[in-house]
């Protein structure tokens, strides 16, 4: 069972940005590499249970300021206590 939270609103994303340890998967339904990496992301969510794992479809949340930063998918952001610490 996956622990990945699928974000459906800007408010929900803002709430999760304050998590102690957060990993965000930015992707799109039309993106083949995104679909390929999804099972790995889900597996990692079960292995690293002290982290919050969320999935953001960039086409559904295109108005969020963080989503506007995304230039390619998949993109992963890592946050700790509300601050971005890394990305790839």
Curated annotation (Swiss-Prot):
The active site is at residues 31, 34. It holds the Pfam family Thioredoxin. One of its GO terms (molecular function) is protein disulfide isomerase activity. Keywords: Disulfide bond, Electron transport, Redox-active center, Transport. Residues 2-88 form the Thioredoxin domain. CDD domains: TRX_family (cd02947). InterPro entries: Thioredoxin, Thioredoxin-like_sf, Thioredoxin_CS, Thioredoxin_domain. GO terms for biological process: cell redox homeostasis; protein folding. The record marks 32-33 as: Contributes to redox potential value. Coiled coil: none annotated. The record marks 25 as: Deprotonates C-terminal active site Cys. PROSITE patterns: THIOREDOXIN_1 (PS00194), THIOREDOXIN_2 (PS51352). SUPFAM superfamilies: Thioredoxin-like. Disulfide bonds join 31-34. It comes from the Eukaryota. Participates in various redox reactions through the reversible oxidation of its active center dithiol to a disulfide and catalyzes dithiol-disulfide exchange reactions. Belongs to the thioredoxin family. This is Thioredoxin-2. The gene is trxB.
């Amino acid at each position: 069972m996956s622990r990945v939270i699928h974000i459906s609103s800007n408010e929900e994303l803002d709430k999760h940005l304050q998590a102690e340890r957060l990993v965000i998967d930015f992707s799109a339904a039309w993106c083949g590499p995104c679909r390929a990496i999804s099972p790995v992301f889900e597996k990692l969510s079960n292995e690293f249970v002290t982290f919050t794992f969320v999935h953001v479809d960039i086409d559904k949340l295109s108005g969020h300021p963080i989503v506007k930063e995304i230039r390619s998918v998949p993109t992963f952001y890592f946050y700790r206590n509300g601050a971005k610490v890394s990305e790839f």
